[in-house]
Amino acid sequence: AIKVFHIVAETGIHARPAT
């Protein structure tokens, strides 16, 4: 899940910080 969050953040949808 952490990896997914990182990908999402890199896409530009910085909705949640990397926990």
From Swiss-Prot:
Q: Which InterPro entries match?
A: HPr-like (IPR000032), PTS_HPr_His_P_site (IPR001020)
| Keyword Zinc attached | no
What does the UniProt entry say about where the protein is found?
Cytoplasm
| Positions of the catalytic residues | H14 (pros-phosphohistidine intermediate)
Gene Ontology terms: cellular component: cytoplasm
* A Gene Ontology biological process term: phosphoenolpyruvate-dependent sugar phosphotransferase system
At the top level, the lineage of the source is Bacteria
The chain positions of domain HPr read 1-19
Q: What UniProt keywords are attached to this protein's entry?
A: Cytoplasm, Phosphotransferase system, Sugar transport, Transcription, Transcription regulation, Transport
Q: What does this protein do?
A: General (non sugar-specific) component of the phosphoenolpyruvate-dependent sugar phosphotransferase system (sugar PTS). This major carbohydrate active-transport system catalyzes the phosphorylation of incoming sugar substrates concomitantly with their translocation across the cell membrane. The phosphoryl group from phosphoenolpyruvate (PEP) is transferred to the phosphoryl carrier protein HPr by enzyme I. Phospho-HPr then transfers it to the PTS EIIA domain.
Q: Which family does it belong to?
A: Belongs to the HPr family.
Q: What is this protein called?
A: Phosphocarrier protein HPr
Q: What is the phylogenetic placement of the source species in the record?
A: Bacteria, Bacillati, Bacillota, Bacilli, Lactobacillales
